[in-house]
Design a protein with these regions (language model features):
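Conserved nucleotide-cofactor-binding alpha/beta core module
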Residues: 55-174
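Class I SAM-dependent transferase core
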Residues: 1-63, 67, 71-79, 92-106, ...
């Protein structure tokens, strides 16, 4: 990770606020930990890499798929992005809203819903960040990406390849791969 703004965000966002009390003493270890509903908070390296791959500029309109603990959401907001975030698990959605409010991080929109559908009513987006492993590239999300926009998405079943998809034209995309990772699965029609 070489982006100083990303490193600064990771250093300045208190990760322990986003974790279950049982794991707070380990909050600054570079590991993923369980949160509610069999989900996880990603390890700091993964959060930093995904954020760096987005190449965020102040004011970028970003769609985040999988609010989860809201740690990644906070990093994006800290970097002055306009964040629209969606979470399929209601308990996580409620908890993340509370934590974001407590820390005074306000996304443009925080929604309980199906991430596979995205938020077309608020698109198109400069960037899309998917924080769960997708078995395939969701076509609905590609449609919500601006021309010249980037989507960072882990693709695969048991393990995933971190992938950046750049929209070149209406139906033309470029893909770049950045190594293997393990994420909780991105599920369709499951809210």
């Amino acid at each position: 990770i070489t982006d100083k703004k990303v490193l600064n965000a990771i250093l300045n966002i208190p990760r322990h606020f986003f974790m279950d009390i049982d794991f707070q003493s380990f909050a600054y270890d570079d590991k993923a930990f369980p949160i509610l509903s069999n989900q996880t908070i990603s390890q700091p390296y993964t959060v930093a890499l995904q954020t760096e791959l987005l190449k965020i500029k102040s004011g970028d309109k970003i769609l985040e798929i999988g609010t989860g603990s809201a740690y990644q959401t906070s990093i994006l907001i800290y970097l002055k992005a306009e964040v629209y975030t969606i979470e399929r698990i209601f308990n996580l959605h409620k908890k993340s809203k509370k934590i974001l409010s407590m820390l005074s991080f306000q996304p443009k929109k925080i929604v309980w819903g199906d991430g596979y559908l995205g938020l077309p009513e608020f698109g198109p987006f400069d960037k899309i960040l998917v924080t769960a492993g997708a078995s395939e590239i969701p076509k609905n999300l590609l449609k919500q990406l601006k021309f010249g926009g980037k989507m960072v998405i882990p693709i695969g079943n048991k393990s995933q390849e971190m992938t950046v998809i750049e929209r070149i034209e209406k139906e033309k995309f470029k893909k770049y791969k950045y190594g293997k990772f393990n994420f909780v699965p991105m599920l369709k029609n499951k809210i």
